[in-house]
Structures are given as structure tokens and as C-alpha cells.
């Protein structure tokens, strides 16, 4: 919200997010620990309603924890992506293991027939490795559109696959 120039308040967050938890845990674990019912249908319906009400040609539906992260005890983030049938913007950051994690996510998305609109590789802080290196390694094995977001350079600093 803040990045979009919106005021962050409990009301503004609840208008776009069905559940929000303090602990940085997979959604199913966070819901279980908070005593919140894990209702995949409610999550899917809420998200579809948000998309409809926005009336926009684009909608960012942010997942938590990655493509294969459990959303509920019986559904993964990738299940929601497939049910919504939206193009995927995959976000990665350069760290040890990122090549493997990113290629695995790409393969999982491809196996489900999900369109990867772009892979955004961000640099979370100035000390992080250059995102271009991760882009080069990913592109060595899989051809996907890639955009780079260097630290402090704005949303999209360059396009590694152009």
C-alpha cells in the first residue's frame, strides 16, 4: 500500500488482505497457530471478488512464502495461482541457493501450465549480490522474461532478457 502511495491502516489492509499475521510463517502454520479456520474456498472467493471489484486489467495477488508454500493444510500457493489463472510474476533475490529455488519454481509453474509473465530479481539490500548474476544463471537453463530491480533503483531497473 505504502509503495502505491496509499495510507497503511487496519482498514486499508483488511480491504485487500483476508488474513494477516505477525509471525513470518507459511500461511497454513500462521493460521493454525492463530486459531484461524483454513478455508481455501473463502480465500479463493475473497481473491476473485477483489479482482472483480477492482475492474482493472491488471491485479497483483501477492503470495506468501513461495510457489510451493502451503496456503492451507491441503492447498499450496500454486493451487491458488492455477485457480485464478492469472499470469505469474515470479520474484526472486540473489542468495546462496537462489538459482535452485528459482529454477524449481519455474519448473513447478510450467508443469501446472501457468504463464510466467516475468521473473523479477530484486536486490533487497546494497550488500546483496548483483541480481544480474542470478539472471544470467537462470537464463542459462530456462528462457523466461527477466527484469532486474537493483537496490534503491526503483521498481524495474533493467531488463536482463531484452
Model region roles, listed by residue range:
Residues 14-19, 120-123, 144-154:
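Beta-strand->loop->alpha-helix junctions that form or flank phosphate-binding loops
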Residues 42, 49, 63-143, 147:
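Conserved catalytic-core segment of NTP-binding enzymes
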Residues 54-59:
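Loop/turn-to-beta-strand initiation segments
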Residues 1-37:
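N-terminal phosphate/diphosphate-binding loop that engages ATP/GTP or pyrophosphate donors
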Residues 25, 139-160:
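Beta-strand-loop-alpha "switch" segments that mediate conformational coupling across diverse proteins
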Residues 33-48:
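Glycine-rich phosphate- or other oxyanion-binding loops that anchor nucleotides, phosphorylated ligands
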Residues 30-33, 132-136, 157-162:
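Short, surface-exposed amphipathic charged segments that create phosphate/polyanion-binding patches used
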